[in-house]
Amino acid sequence: MAKILVVDDEKAIRNALRDILEHEKHTVEEAEDGAAGLEKAKKGGFDVVLCDIKMPKLDGLEFLQKLMAHNDEVPVIMISGHGTIDTAVDALKKGAFDFIEKPPNISRILVAVRNALDRGNLMQETKTLRQK
């Protein structure tokens, strides 16, 4: 299945997301803050990134901007317990694929990840067709 990076400073959230995603047969890697997450994400190989907004060292919106400057093809799903509509809109304007409020609902996470993977597959197919 997919390789997914979970970036969140709350271990309980990382563990919950890992359990949900691994149950769906995805491979999951974790990072405990935005800086560690950015380092892992820049190495590539991830199909989707799930990222918290409020984190130490590098917050989620800064993480998103830096990752988009490096690789704008990987879908990033932002997750926040402190999110407002303005925060969600800001994240989407900066390139986030989706925005989920904490505590995350299992169905909502799975739908967002599935949609992000579908988008990634469509982008890859489009790229392949353009090369022909």
Where are these regions (language model features)?
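Active-site residues of response regulator receiver
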Residues: 8, 52, 80
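Two-component/phosphorelay signaling modules centered on CheY-like receiver
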Residues: 11-29, 43
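Acidic catalytic/metal-coordinating carboxylates
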Residues: 32-36, 59-62
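Short amphipathic alpha-helix used as the core "switch/output" element in two-component signaling
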Residues: 39, 61-73, 90
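Active-site beta3 strand of CheY-like receiver
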Residues: 44-50
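Receiver (REC) domain active-site loop signature in two-component systems and cognate sites
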Residues: 55
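Flexible nucleotide-interacting loop at or near the entrance of a catalytic core
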Residues: 108-132
